[in-house]
Amino acid sequence: MGRYSVEPDNATKSCKARGSNLRVHFKNTRETAQAIKRMSLRRAQRYLKNVIAKKEIVPFRRFNGGVGRKAQAKAWGCTQGRWPKKSAEFLWQLLRNAESNADYKGLDVDRLVIDHIQVNRAPKMRRRTYRAHGRINPYMSSPCHVEVILSEKEQVVAAPTPDEDAPKKKQSKKKMARQKLMQRD
């Protein structure tokens, strides 16, 4: 069992999942993970399915050199985006694993939110490609480690409505005297 970089605030109301040395591009996976951070579990799964079907886009904000401009990215407040299919599939599988962990712990799956998701670089894997004039160049892959923590969202309690029974705001003697003078006039 590997270590997580962050421990959840309430361990009984959260679940974890992680993947190590995943053969999927680090940069694409990082941008996809940033897009689903703080989403509910159901919304994130639906979003990743839409990315695979090219109905929703992943905004590329940090690793955006050479990334084309797309109209769908306007929904995210940026101009550049892509549909990283393999990254979306890997993250979807990881969310499914976290969901089954939550189900095993007896958590309410419909109230789960992605509290923490992190993508780290893994050791590069080396291959070679053959070039002209007998040269050989490296042909590296950029795998990654991914960890996700889902937490149950707390029930939102409505704020109390202001009633007539509520205590009135205190006023200074000076202010009360001024109001009495204003009422006489």
Curated annotation (Swiss-Prot):
SUPFAM superfamilies according to UniProt: Ribosomal protein L22
Stretches the record annotates as Disordered: 157-185
InterPro entries recorded: Ribosomal_uL22 (IPR001063), Ribosomal_uL22_CS (IPR018260), Ribosomal_uL22_euk/arc (IPR005721), Ribosomal_uL22_sf (IPR036394)
Pfam families for this protein: Ribosomal_L22
One of the GO biological process terms: cytoplasmic translation
Molecular function as annotated in GO: structural constituent of ribosome
Highest taxon of the lineage: Eukaryota
GO cellular component, one term: cytosolic large ribosomal subunit
Keywords: Ribonucleoprotein, Ribosomal protein
Feature: compositional bias, Basic residues: 169-178
Family to which this protein belongs: Belongs to the universal ribosomal protein uL22 family.
Protein name in UniProt: Large ribosomal subunit protein uL22
Species of provenance: Argas monolakensis (Mono lake bird tick)
Highest classification ranks of the organism: Eukaryota, Metazoa, Ecdysozoa, Arthropoda, Chelicerata
This protein's encoding gene: RpL17
